Amino acid sequence: MTIALTGGGTGGHLAIVRCLLESAIKKNIECVYIGSQNGQDKAWFENEARFKEKFFLSSKGVVNQNKFGKISSLLHTLKLSKDCREIFKKYHIQAVFSVGGYSAAPASFAALFSHLPLFIHEQNSKSGSLNMLLKPFATKFFSAFEKEFSPYPVANKFFDNARIRKELKNIIFLGGSQGAQFINELALNLAPKLQEQNIKIIHQCGKNDFEKCKKHYQSLNIQADVFDFSSNLGEKMKNADLAISRAGASTLFELCANTLPAIFIPYPYATKNHQYFNAKFLQDQALCQIFTQDSINLDDFFKAMLKLNLEDISTRLQNIAQKNGGDILLEKALSNNLAFIR
């Protein structure tokens, strides 16, 4: 059996694709990847040999364009969807699994035009424009935030390194692989207070601020674990007792899998303010704290960190993320829809 995996643009989307690929391989399902020349798709998968084939199309987004730009992008997407139908025929694709993002549009529309089963995974609490449009036509729509709960695919390494936290000895600041300037500045401003409490610092600061952050810690004589990017983030999280982080869905569920308590500072310019609502999913269960970027007072923030009941939160986080989520999604998608797949 061969399926197409499509979507991407951001690391969060692409991490789900990778989980689904690994799950498909375990089930002896071959995968063709259809992404975009833009975004991070090529950087992630251009050299991924486990795909049967990879296609990086000239797809582009429709959001934030003027009227004529939207029309032009839609026409271009329809043209690319025709190319995807040829890919489906050539590789005998039997189903399409989309993780969203504009790079998923051509293959998703092609699935509908070709009468192939279309499965969609929405990663955020607020659906993206493409997923909202296609949801009524999808064979199955998966979301970890909806009442009909579906697991969020997270790499097993985050589960394998999980532990119950009891005391704040180490803190990790997660600005993402691209860095988050606000979180970087917050970490540097908190550093003297953390040193006074003998709390060790782990700091993912991104490439742009790496030298600046490293020099700042050195000037304070603080032995911080500063890095721009790590392929072994699960191990870094394992060493931490609390995370200060943005609230992208992948990061949020990786923290849950690792049972690592967090204070979230949602990116204020995220589409539909989805990072805030991602974090609110946990806050409503008393499993995190949220500070908006424009309301942070350094002293209040530091006090909130020290007051968290880490053991209680860490213990209850075990019930949020589900191991082998990719396996479960594929099982739900394919086993219940065999009538569609010939």
Swiss-Prot record:
User: Which Gene Ontology molecular-function terms are recorded?
Assistant: UDP-N-acetyl-D-glucosamine:N-acetylmuramoyl-L-alanyl-D-glutamyl-meso-2,6-diaminopimelyl-D-alanyl-D-alanine-diphosphoundecaprenol 4-beta-N-acetylglucosaminlytransferase activity; undecaprenyldiphospho-muramoylpentapeptide beta-N-acetylglucosaminyltransferase activity
Question: Under which main EC class is this enzyme filed?
Answer: transferase
| GO BP | carbohydrate metabolic process; cell division; cell wall organization; lipid glycosylation; peptidoglycan biosynthetic process; regulation of cell shape
In which compartments does the protein localize?
Answer: Cell inner membrane
Q: What is its membrane topology?
A: Peripheral membrane protein
**Single GO cellular component annotation?**
plasma membrane
Catalytic reaction list: di-trans,octa-cis-undecaprenyl diphospho-N-acetyl-alpha-D-muramoyl-L-alanyl-D-glutamyl-meso-2,6-diaminopimeloyl-D-alanyl-D-alanine + UDP-N-acetyl-alpha-D-glucosamine = di-trans,octa-cis-undecaprenyl diphospho-[N-acetyl-alpha-D-glucosaminyl-(1->4)]-N-acetyl-alpha-D-muramoyl-L-alanyl-D-glutamyl-meso-2,6-diaminopimeloyl-D-alanyl-D-alanine + UDP + H(+)
Keywords, in A-Z order = Cell cycle, Cell division, Cell inner membrane, Cell membrane, Cell shape, Cell wall biogenesis/degradation, Glycosyltransferase, Membrane, Peptidoglycan synthesis, Transferase
- The yes or no answer to whether the keyword Oxidoreductase is present is no
Q: Please state which protein family the record places this protein in.
A: Belongs to the glycosyltransferase 28 family. MurG subfamily.
**Protein name as catalogued:** UDP-N-acetylglucosamine--N-acetylmuramyl-(pentapeptide) pyrophosphoryl-undecaprenol N-acetylglucosamine transferase
The source organism is Campylobacter jejuni subsp. doylei (strain ATCC BAA-1458 / RM4099 / 269.97)
